[in-house]
């Protein structure tokens, strides 16, 4: 009985009180100071952090953890967890849970940070009304439903790996500022009343066909890559700085209201004509690769740093006014025969394998290099087809390196040194 045990002077570290042998082992090792096989009131009070590694056990029970009313942080690594009840751990602030399966979970409403890496969680992650919640992290695994409606959550994000999640419910989360998930199998998203959102990233967003962001007037960054969305309105999102609709079904967009846009990506979409922006001189990154676009007008794109026009239908590319360019990708752009980058002194990467380029002018680009962390240079690799003349500067330190690399790859390159 919980109330009897909680009011007693001590709790025996037995299988009856703590069915998990891994939990008993941790308690004996770290908290049974006098090694009498029991936890005194003082020892129980001192249990503020608990780390239970049960990966070698087939299943684990957390029965007994409810006694630790002073517990602040719990790290649990397990295989099969049938049920977790942390509702009585009122002071619990941080939960880190990594498991193969979790079938049922009940949490303390005073949680601040949670991290889940669960391969299979068929139950609902229920954070409704959690007024102290700040961050939810989901890592590699399959989850059914996340419901954080009415909570104080500020950030919902993934860890290092994509997740599978069917439902996201976060209505009326007044403090929510960022939802950043690389998520598959998504069927439903409800963010109504969450109007303070600044970042919304739903990459690989499964079966989602519609998304209404009209009331998210503070939105700065929006990504809906890999969705089935065919139309998307951002007319009300005047603070938008980054938009990524790559790998979606979208064919056109009205961006006339988005004067603060800096990053625009629409790779592998049905867009067949360059999307018009109201303030082209603010654009720093443009990715229109893998589309049927046949022409690009970049005369006013004076701040452009990164351009990806790989596998497009363009026949010419004028970037004379784009003096800030750092990377240019035109890989597989077979109809492009000439590329003049003589004005680009800040250039580091030019990726043009399998393109139709016969002449490439990089005479003022002394920074092209793939021997540091700043870029991949020309990205000469076996398997690509390159046959062209490259005009380079005599002071370019990497010339011999790339000449040798081109020979090793079997490329037919004529080097003109100026």
PLM feature segments, named:
Residues 50-53, 74-76, 95-97, 114-116, ...:
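Conserved hydrophobic beta-strand positions in leucine-rich repeat
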Residues 310, 321-393:
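Ankyrin-repeat and related helical/solenoid repeat scaffolds used for protein-protein interactions
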Residues 53, 77, 87, 98, ...:
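Feature marks extracellular polysaccharide-active and adherence modules
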Residues 60-65, 84-86, 105, 125, ...:
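Canonical leucine-rich repeat
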Residues 1-75, 90, 126-131, 140, ...:
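N-terminal capping/linker segments that flank leucine-rich repeat
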Residues 47, 71, 81, 92, ...:
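Conserved hydrophobic position(s) of the canonical leucine-rich repeat
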């Amino acid at each position: 009985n919980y109330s009897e045990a909680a009011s007693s002077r001590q709790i025996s570290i037995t299988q009856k009180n703590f069915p998990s042998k891994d939990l008993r082992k941790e308690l004996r090792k770290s908290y049974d100071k006098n090694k009498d096989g029991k936890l005194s009131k003082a020892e129980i009070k001192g249990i503020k952090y608990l780390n239970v590694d049960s990966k070698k056990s087939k299943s684990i029970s957390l029965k007994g953890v409810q006694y630790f009313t002073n517990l602040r942080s719990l790290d649990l690594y397990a295989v099969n967890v049938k049920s977790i009840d942390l509702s009585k751990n009122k002071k619990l602030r941080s939960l880190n849970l990594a498991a193969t399966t979790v079938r049922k979970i009940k949490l303390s409403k005073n949680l601040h940070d949670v991290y889940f890496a669960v391969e299979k969680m068929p139950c609902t992650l229920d954070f409704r009304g959690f007024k102290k919640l700040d961050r939810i992290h989901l890592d590699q695994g399959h989850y059914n439903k996340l419901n954080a409606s009415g909570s104080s959550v500020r950030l919902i994000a993934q860890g290092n790996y994509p997740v599978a999640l069917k439902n996201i419910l976060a209505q009326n989360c007044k403090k929510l500022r960022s939802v950043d998930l690389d998520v598959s199998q998504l069927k439903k998203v409800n963010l109504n009343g969450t109007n303070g959102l600044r970042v919304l990233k739903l990459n690989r967003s499964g079966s989602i066909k519609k998304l209404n962001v009209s009331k998210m007037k503070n939105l700065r960054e929006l990504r809906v890559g890999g969705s089935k969305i065919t139309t998307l309105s951002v007319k009300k999102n005047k603070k938008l700085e980054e938009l990524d609709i790559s790998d979606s079904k979208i064919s056109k967009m009205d961006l006339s209201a988005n004067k603060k846009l800096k990053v625009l990506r629409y790779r592998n979409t049905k867009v067949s004509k360059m999307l018009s922006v109201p303030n082209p001189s603010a654009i720093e990154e443009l990715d229109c690769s893998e589309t049927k676009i046949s022409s690009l007008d970049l005369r006013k794109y004076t701040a452009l740093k990164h351009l990806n026009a790989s596998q497009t239908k363009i026949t010419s590319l004028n970037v004379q006014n784009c003096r800030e360019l750092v990377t240019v990708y035109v890989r597989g752009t077979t109809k492009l025969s000439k590329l003049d980058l003589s004005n680009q002194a800040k250039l580091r990467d030019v990726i043009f394998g399998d393109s139709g380029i016969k002449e490439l002018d990089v005479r003022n680009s002394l920074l092209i290099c793939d021997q540091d962390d700043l870029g991949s240079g020309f990205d000469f690799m076996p398997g690509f087809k390159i046959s062209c003349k490259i005009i380079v500067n005599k002071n370019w330190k990497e010339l011999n390196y790339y000449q040798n690399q081109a020979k090793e790859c079997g490329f037919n390159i004529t080097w003109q040194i100026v």
